[in-house]
């Protein structure tokens, strides 16, 4: 299968690319923004993979990629990329531009890429879309997460719309809701991590590799699995 992973050169995205690339039946395409060295190391490890440098904050860069994407036969799309940070200020201290910028850089590109992939999936009567969001959308998000959590909440509803509209075309759309992980994206200090561990049922943080395993599960699941959300949080937020 041809699988596209956005934001695939580092952190969770890299773990997903590595896990999916273990199967020789998969051709994994992934985007990266600035970390060419990391992208090259993945290509050395998995020669069948392909990397595309895309800046999701740049309309021209996205436009060029979407044009290239039209010629590719993407069977599975993993929407993972996020431009920016999760932690911010409280709502009353956050400039309105931070909300509009986050929407422009994270939601619009995702919609653009997803629309393009769906057009090909419709023709082939098959497709899987897996959206990486956050467990914060099913619980009260931490203080300062209003920008990040709001963009992810939009993607959550967008995914549900896709699952309904394209089920008859054998296209599924599901979400993975991971809890906090330690990656390049992480912003908590040692003290904050320690406090988090005190209340964690397993006394250990989630790893990117564990989340990647759930993505592989969704990839191999029946097309009956559609419109669902899988929280990965040790049962801390029961849906």
Language-model regions, residue ranges each:
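Catalytic Tyr-X3-Lys loop
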Residues: 92-111, 126, 130, 155, ...
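Conserved glycine-rich cofactor-binding loop
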Residues: 9-10
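Conserved mid-core segment of classical short-chain dehydrogenase/reductases
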Residues: 67, 82-100, 123, 143-147, ...
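Catalytic loop of short-chain dehydrogenase/reductase
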Residues: 83-84, 128-154, 159-168, 180
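Short, small/polar-rich loop/turn modules that mediate ligand/substrate recognition or access, typified
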Residues: 167, 172, 225-227
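C-terminal substrate-recognition "lid" of short-chain dehydrogenase/reductases
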Residues: 208-232, 237
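Conserved glycine-rich Rossmann-like NAD(P)H-binding loop of the short-chain dehydrogenase/reductase
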Residues: 24-40
């Amino acid at each position: 299968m041809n699988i596209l992973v956005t934001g695939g050169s580092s952190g969770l995205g890299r773990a997903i690319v590595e896990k999916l690339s273990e199967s020789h039946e998969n051709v994994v395409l992934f985007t990266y923004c600035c970390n060419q060295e990391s992208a090259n190391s993945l290509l050395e490890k998995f020669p069948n993979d392909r990397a595309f440098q895309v800046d999701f904050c740049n309309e021209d860069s996205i436009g060029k990629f979407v044009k290239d994407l039209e010629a590719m036969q993407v069977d599975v799309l993993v929407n993972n990329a996020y431009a920016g940070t999760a932690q911010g200020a409280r709502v009353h201290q956050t400039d309105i531009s931070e909300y509009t910028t986050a929407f422009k850089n994270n939601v619009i590109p995702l919609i653009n890429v997803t629309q393009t992939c769906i057009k090909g999936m419709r023709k082939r009567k098959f497709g899987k879309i897996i959206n990486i969001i956050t467990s914060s959308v099913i619980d009260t998000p931490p203080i300062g997460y209003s920008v990040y959590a709001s963009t992810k909440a939009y993607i959550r509803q967008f995914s549900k719309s896709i699952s309904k509209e394209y089920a008859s075309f054998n296209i599924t759309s599901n979400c993975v809701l991971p809890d906090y992980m330690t990656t390049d994206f992480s912003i908590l200090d040692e003290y904050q991590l320690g406090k988090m561990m005190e209340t964690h049922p397993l006394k250990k943080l989630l790893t990117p590799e564990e989340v990647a395993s759930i993505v592989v599960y969704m990839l191999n699941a029946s097309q009956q699995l559609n419109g669902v959300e899988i929280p990965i949080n040790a049962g801390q937020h029961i849906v």
